[in-house]
Every structure is written in structure tokens, then in C-alpha cells.
């Protein structure tokens, strides 16, 4: 309004001097491409040479400068990203195609199916469900629209590019702590190959991968958390949108924000701040807590009635690791690193806790996340239609511990060399050597495992479906599916109700709990006491019982011996 009242020339006169919108977009694209080219292949500026000096005979003998690959690879950023891309391609050799397996369900054919599933009020999952669809379905639908609606292509590209994107996001944060690329690039490289990152890719954990990418951007956007009133409302709302995207994938983000913001409010209250300053801080902090939770409604509101959803992640509910494994920074579960690949995360946090630099603050945050992860890993939850409890997956909490550990390591190493040179040999030299040895051993062991045995992960491409073709021919026909899961030493039998096709993205998240009568009938069918199981199944419209090979022959003979069932 102020410029409108003070302008001297009308907008019609000015518009003739402004280039068209398409020209501006094309010029911006050219500038971005030129900036990337100059960053990757820097050009040395040469001073202008006169025509007389250029014709001198001795200048003709000077060789011209040529592009050398060795100079390019000496750039730590280019070498780090290139090495990570090569490792990712080798360990992803079984993931070129439509992905499923682990916690990742099969992708629908296109974005239209995702949009339809998101807006449906009744879902044909199991016995039927009226639960609200999670907001991450809409996020995937919008992203797949950019790829011409190819949802399977989006999921494949996301898992292939995830390690590089995680490294880039971590590097953008770590370079704020140190200008030495020989420290920040290896640190971001290890962040992308951390146990939680490798396990998330192998087991199909969408939410944890998104958290690994978004977490480093949060302290960049909100650089001054203690004096939050200095941040503009535009920055606050921008962070709200970023937190809403993360909350749409996992509601544990709300619990983390509740703990962090609650602690900050109590600290401000103890400092006895002036009332205007205290209110200015509390308004912006509560905005970061409430707005992301509202933006992912109504799925978030249903979690208030079913608190177990705060600990659930997208996809099938697979068990996480034990508390001892989580304490080492490894979330455990299917596709996780073996126990002998010891991560330096806990050692870094302990060393940084006794540091006199800013590394101590990062260590305090990291240990808080680590303690929360160990606590919740001992809890079993019942979500996504499961009738039995499953050990909680705490990968999202370990993201905070991993990022804090890497940041503390960067702060320590940035000033470690000068401190060690200026001091005599004492415990700092021993701890530094021990840390470097553990980090090197983890790097070699994790990379070696990921490109060999780790490539045969639960998430693979073009995996065979569970349901055979003759059962998928009848649409919406209810089928009780029995299959064995687990290792050769400890096997268990799982069952679920199918609607004529394999479960797809989003369906496990809206699945309702099993009907108690069907649950009892299925258990009696397996143990051989289900004389009336066929009557219960027919009463609920279950037409077929499908046993997925390999399966115990004794259980199959038991089912054949019961009345009311006929082989087809």
C-alpha cells in the first residue's frame, strides 16, 4: 500500500520493461545450470593477453590446459557423492523395478488410485474399515503426479536416490558447523550410511527415510531456538509445513515436538522473563506444535483415541530390535545390520558429553533421543489390524541421535588437530585414536555387508505376490490367508483376510482390528480344535482359505480333517 501511494509511474508503463514470465523462468534455469557447472568443474580465470604477446614464439610452446579427471576427484564433495552413488547402485542391484517387501506394501498402478484411496470414507481392507487415510498418501499422490502418475516409479526412484539425498541434506547442515570439507563430507557420508539409514532402505521404512532427509533442515530453518521470538512468522510457518510433511508420515514427530517445546516453555518460565517476551516465545512455540498436527487431520485426531498410532509407521507393522541393539544406534528388525558392525554413535556422544565446546549441547540432545529410543523399544504396540503386540520401531528417534552424534563429531574434529598439536600426549590423543579406529572399522564393515549380504534385503523388485491368479479373478472375495513367517529355528503362523489381491500402500494403515470371533476361529483352525470354524467363516462372508507355501504339512492335514472345508 505504501509503494502504491508513492509511485510516480503507472504499472502499464513499467510492464513494457519487464521480460515475459517464460523468459524469466528460462533465464533462472540457465543461471542454476551455470552455477552447478561452475561448482562441479571450476574454471580458472585467466588475465587478458595482448595480441603482440600471444604471437611470441615462446608462448607457442606452452601446452594448453586440458580437463583432468584426477583434479576432479580431488574435490572431496565430488568424490564423496560419487562414491556413495556407486555403493548405492551396487547394493540396490535387486531393486530396479516395482518395489515391495518388508514394511513396504505393493504400490498401486497410478496416482489416481492413491487419490481415490485418500478420499474414500470406506476402505475394502479385511472386513472393511472406516478409518481416515493417512496424509502421507496425499503427499505420495502429489509427488507421483510429477512423474506422470507412475506411483511404482516414484517409490523406486525414492529408494534409489534416498542415500544421496540424505547425504546432501546432512551436508547442508554440517557445513554450518565447519568450513572444512574434508570433515563435513566424510561426516555426511557416514550419516547416509548410518545403521538407521541402511536398515530403513532395506526394510522399506518410508517415514524414517523422510525423517533422515528433513531432520538436518530443521535447525537450518530455525537457527535460533532459544530466542525463538527473533524468527519471523514466515520462517515459523515454513517450518510448520516441513514438520507437517514429517508428521504425515509418522506421528511420533508430535511427541518429540511436545517434549522439546514443553522443556523450552518450562525453561523460559524459570528464567522469569518479562510477560511480553514470554508470550512472544510461547505463541511461536505452540504454533510449531499445534499447526503440523492440525494439517494432517483427521488421521491425527484419530490417534488421540488410539494412542498406539503415535508410534506406528507407514506400511506393515514389523518388529524393531531389542534395547541392547538400539543402544548401539541400530534400530534392528528385518534388514538391519548384524550386531558385529559396531557403530561409533554412542562413543561419539559419550566423548562429546565431556567436551568444553558446542559439542556438549549436541551430545545432550543426542543422548536424550537415544534414551527415548531405548525406552520405547521395550514397548510392544498393536496397530494396523494386528491382534498381537509387536516391538516398537524406533528408527525415527534414532535419526535424532545419529544426527546429533555426527554434528558433535564435526565440532570436535574441527578444532581437534590444533588442540592435539599444542598439548602433550594424554587421554585426548587416546580417545581420538580410538574414535578413528572404530569409525574406520564401521565404515569398512557396513559397506562390505551392504554390497554383499545386505543386497538380499526384504525390499526387492518384482517379488511374487502372495495371492494366486485364480483367487484374484473374483473381485472383493474374502479369503483367509495363512502363511509361515520367521527363521528356520523360530517360525510362527500369520493370517489375514484378503479381498482378492495383495495389500497395497496405505491399506495396512487403515486396517481395523480383527473380529474376535474370526480370531478365535482361525486359532482353532490351526491347532485342530476348530470344529465350527467353517460356520464362523461363512457367517462373515469368508469364501476361501489359502495356505501359502512353504507351510507345515501337519497343519494342512489338520485342516483337511476338520469338517466344512472342500479343496478347490
Predicted features along the sequence, with ranges:
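Start-transfer (signal-anchor) and selected internal transmembrane alpha helices
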Residues: 29, 47-92
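Periplasmic/ER-lumenal interhelical loops and adjacent helix-loop junctions
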Residues: 37, 41-48, 53, 117-123, ...
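Active-site lumenal/periplasmic loops and adjacent helix-entry segments of GT-C-fold
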Residues: 89-216, 221, 225, 229-231
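Membrane-helix boundary/interfacial segments in multi-pass membrane proteins
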Residues: 103-110, 197-209, 315-331, 365-428
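Perimembrane helix-loop-helix junctions
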Residues: 224, 256-290
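Short hydrophobic alpha-helices at membrane interfaces in multi-pass membrane enzymes
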Residues: 226-245, 283
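Signature aromatic-anchored transmembrane alpha helix within multi-pass, membrane-resident enzymes
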Residues: 416-446
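Extracytoplasmic/lumenal acceptor-recognition loop(s) of multi-pass membrane glycoenzymes
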Residues: 470-540
Amino acid at each position: 500500500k505504501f509503494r502504491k501511494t508513492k509511485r510516480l509511474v503507472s504499472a502499464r508503463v513499467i510492464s513494457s520493461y519487464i521480460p515475459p514470465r517464460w523468459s524469466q523462468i528460462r533465464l533462472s534455469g540457465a543461471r542454476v545450470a551455470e552455477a552447478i557447472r561452475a561448482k562441479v568443474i571450476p574454471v580458472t580465470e585467466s588475465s587478458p593477453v595482448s595480441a603482440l604477446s600471444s604471437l611470441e614464439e615462446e608462448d607457442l610452446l606452452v601446452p594448453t590446459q586440458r580437463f583432468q579427471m584426477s583434479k576432479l576427484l580431488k574435490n572431496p564433495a565430488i568424490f564423496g557423492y560419487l562414491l556413495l552413488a556407486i555403493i548405492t547402485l551396487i547394493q540396490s542391484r535387486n531393486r530396479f523395478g516395482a518395489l515391495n517387501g518388508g514394511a513396504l506394501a505393493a504400490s498401486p498402478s497410478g496416482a489416481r488410485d492413491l487419490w481415490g484411496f485418500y478420499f474414500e470414507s470406506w476402505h475394502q481392507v479385511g472386513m472393511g474399515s472406516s478409518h481416515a487415510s493417512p496424509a502421507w498418501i496425499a503427499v505420495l499422490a502429489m509427488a507421483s503426479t510429477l512423474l506422470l502418475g507412475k506411483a511404482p516409479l516414484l517409490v523406486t526412484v525414492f529408494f534409489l536416490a534416498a542415500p544421496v539425498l540424505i547425504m546432501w541434506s546432512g551436508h547442508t547442515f554440517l557445513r554450518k558447523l565447519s568450513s572444512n570439507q574434508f570433515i563435513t563430507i566424510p561426516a555426511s557420508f557416514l550419516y547416509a550410511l548410518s545403521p538407521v539409514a541402511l536398515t530403513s532402505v532395506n526394510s522399506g521404512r518410508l517415514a524414517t527415510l523422510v525423517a533422515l532427509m528433513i531432520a538436518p533442515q530443521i535447525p537450518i530453518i530455525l537457527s535460533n531456538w532459544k530466542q525463538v521470538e527473533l524468527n519471523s512468522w514466515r520462517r515459523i510457518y515454513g517450518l510448520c509445513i516441513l514438520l507437517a510433511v514429517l508428521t504425515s508420515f509418522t506421528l511420533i514427530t508430535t511427541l518429540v515436538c511436545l517434549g522439546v517445546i514443553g522443556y523450552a516453555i518450562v525453561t523460559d518460565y524459570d528464567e522469569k522473563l518479562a510477560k511480553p517476551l514470554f508470550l512472544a516465545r510461547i505463541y511461536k512455540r505452540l504454533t510449531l506444535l499445534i499447526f503440523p498436527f492440525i494439517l494432517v487431520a483427521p488421521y491425527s485426531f484419530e490417534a488421540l483415541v488410539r494412542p498406539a498410532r503415535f508410534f506406528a509407521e507407514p506400511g506393515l507393522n514389523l518388529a524393531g530390535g531389542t534395547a541392547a541393539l538400539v543402544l548401539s544406534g541400530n534400530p534392528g528388525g528385518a534388514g538391519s545390520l548384524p550386531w558385529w558392525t559396531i557403530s561409533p554413535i554412542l562413543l561419539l556422544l559419550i566423548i562429546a558429553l565431556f567436551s568444553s565446546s558446542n559439542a556438549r549441547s549436541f551430545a545432550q540432545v543426542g543422548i536424550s533421543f537415544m534414551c527415548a529410543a531405548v525406552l520405547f523399544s521395550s514397548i510392544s504396540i498393536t496397530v494396523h489390524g494386528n491382534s498381537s503386540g509387536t516391538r516398537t520401531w524406533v528408527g525415527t528417534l534414532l535419526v535424532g541421535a545419529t544426527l546429533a552424534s555426527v554434528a558433535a563429531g564435526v565440532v570436535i574434529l574441527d578444532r581437534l588437530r590444533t588442540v592435539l598439536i599444542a598439548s602433550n600426549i594424554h587421554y585426548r590423543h587416546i580417545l581420538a585414536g580410538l574414535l578413528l579406529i572404530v569409525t574406520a572399522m564401521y565404515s569398512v564393515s557396513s559397506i562390505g555387508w551392504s554390497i554383499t549380504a545386505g543386497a538380499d534385503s526384504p525390499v526387492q523388485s518384482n517379488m511374487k505376490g502372495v495371492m494366486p491368479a485364480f483367487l484374484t479373478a473374483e473381485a472383493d472375495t474374502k479369503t483367509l490367508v495363512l502363511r509361515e513367517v520367521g527363521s528356520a529355528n523360530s517360525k510362527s503362523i500369520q493370517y489375514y483376510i484378503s479381498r482378492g489381491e495383495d495389500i497395497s500402500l496405505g491399506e495396512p494403515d487403515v486396517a481395523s482390528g480383527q473380529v474376535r470371533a474370526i480370531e478365535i476361529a482361525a486359532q482353532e483352525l490351526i491347532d485342530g480344535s476348530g470344529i465350527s470354524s467353517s460356520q464362523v467363516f461363512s457367517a462373515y462372508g469368508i469364501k476361501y482359505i489359502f495356505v501359502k507355501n512353504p507351510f507345515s504339512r501337519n497343519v494342512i492335514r489338520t485342516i483337511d480333517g476338520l469338517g466344512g472345508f472342500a479343496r478347490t
